[in-house]
Amino acid sequence: MNMPLSLMQFAPALPEIFVLAMVSLILVIDAAVGDGKRYLAYGLSLVTLAGAAFLTVRDFSTLPVLALGGLFIDDPLSDVLKLFLYLTVAIVLVYSRDYLRVRGLYKGEFFVLALFALLGMMVMVSASHFLTLYLGLELLSLSLYAMVALQRDSSVATEAAMKYFVLGALASGMLLYGMSMVYGVTGSLALGDIAIVLQDGTDLRIPLVFGIVFVVAGLAFKLGAVPFHMWVPDVYHGAPTAMTLFVGSAPKIAAFAFVVRVLGQGLESQVSEWRDMLVILAVLSMAIGNIAAIAQSNLKRMFAYSTISHMGFMLLGVLAGSQNGYGAAMFYVLVYTLMTLGGFGMILLLSRAGFESDRLDDFKGLNRRSPWLAFVMLLLMFSMTGIPPTVGFYAKLAVLQAVVEIGYVWLAVAAVLFSLVGAFYYLRIVKLMYFDTPQDTAPIAPGIDARLLMSANGLAVLALGILPQPLMAVCVQAIGTSF
């Protein structure tokens, strides 16, 4: 039986439609049940992720398919990134469950906001039009603003949310202004049409360059790249750790998709205009991120500056402007997400009622309290540093190879030097865990599911480091087939 054309147009967006329907259902159910049945929202959220993953795998696209009048694209890049988004959000929910429960935050609002944010990210990775990109971005951003402020009785969280909102609104305005200037030059908001017009050349070089500058500035804010990084440390530190884990993981995958769609597809012919801007952003991010992280005594702020430096590293792959470069950047952002889940997840597992395990001193002597969790954290820190045989080493190597291929050897050397600086604060945590006396002697009792997931998280960092080729091949093939 053939579906009408109008319904066929919606077929590639079935995962998004399913998530939206389930969010609406969770809202209704959560409003109807009492506080004692909040686990329903948690369970239904995991069911939503599993259902969306099933639909994505069932209709996995091997070739790009435009839908909804060219506003939406279903291609291997979007499908692969969506699957990683589902996995990331599921891990966040499992890690966060006990943390939220003991702090009175185990409510439907968190799960609804998480799924709305996921929906925004799904729209972003499948957008082939500036309007769709912006719609997905704003849905994600508004969900994150509310999520950061969810702990209403915390003045620190409220302050962080206000900073995030004000700076985010400014960045969104810059991005929208840049899009309007590109539209003024090309006469289109569709990325494919923009690419065709710019390949033929244009006499309006100055407006186009200004438009690209504003677009890149808006993208840099969403990534947390220097000098648009001011919100990152305050939001990571001020928000409850469960919210920090969400903000610091899945949205980076969507931000990568945004960057590669806009720069790698729509503005591909203008690589000479945006490459130098990305070089500056990457160098500043690696420098300031790594140097500022050394001075931090709070682990969440340290990870915030670490994120800034990692985004600088990821931009190295993007500025290469090649299939290998984009593939390396995609591999890097997926690996970064895996490491971030483990790092913040460890803070969640070690925290308990009335105690936030977010200071460096809280990790002193962890090997005596829980040798296995200390070993998992060691693997995560080694991977963030880039020490073989963990996957962080291969991710950095792939990005550096892409940069060297375009002749930017000096940039690769600078990246290696900044990585050596970053090794100090990562290995400091290892030293605290294995050579210092524990200050906290309370038993560590995470749930069995969280403990198993953390173990898998750490071992995945090691396994992907030993066998990185399959995931790298998926990334390069997804980029090559989609572009």
Curated annotation (Swiss-Prot):
Keyword Transferase: no
TM annotation in the entry: 13-33, 39-57, 76-96, 110-130, 131-151, 165-185, 206-226, 240-260, 277-297, 302-322, 330-350, 373-393, 406-426, 459-479
Protein location: Cell inner membrane
N-terminal signal peptide: none
Pfam families: Proton_antipo_M
A molecular-function term among this protein's GO annotations: NADH dehydrogenase (ubiquinone) activity
Catalytic activity as recorded in UniProt: a quinone + NADH + 5 H(+)(in) = a quinol + NAD(+) + 4 H(+)(out)
One Gene Ontology term from the biological process aspect of the record: ATP synthesis coupled electron transport
UniProt entry keywords in alphabetical sequence: Cell inner membrane, Cell membrane, Membrane, NAD, Quinone, Translocase, Transmembrane, Transmembrane helix, Transport, Ubiquinone
Membrane topology recorded in Swiss-Prot or TrEMBL: Multi-pass membrane protein
GO cellular component terms given for this protein: plasma membrane
Domain of life: Bacteria
Main subcellular location: membrane
Record EC number: 7.1.1.-
Family annotation (NCBIfam families): NDH_I_N, PRK05777.1-5
Function summary: NDH-1 shuttles electrons from NADH, via FMN and iron-sulfur (Fe-S) centers, to quinones in the respiratory chain. The immediate electron acceptor for the enzyme in this species is believed to be ubiquinone. Couples the redox reaction to proton translocation (for every two electrons transferred, four hydrogen ions are translocated across the cytoplasmic membrane), and thus conserves the redox energy in a proton gradient.
Similarity remark: Belongs to the complex I subunit 2 family.
Subunit and interaction comment: NDH-1 is composed of 14 different subunits. Subunits NuoA, H, J, K, L, M, N constitute the membrane sector of the complex.
Protein name: NADH-quinone oxidoreductase subunit N
Organism for this UniProt entry: Thiobacillus denitrificans (strain ATCC 25259 / T1)
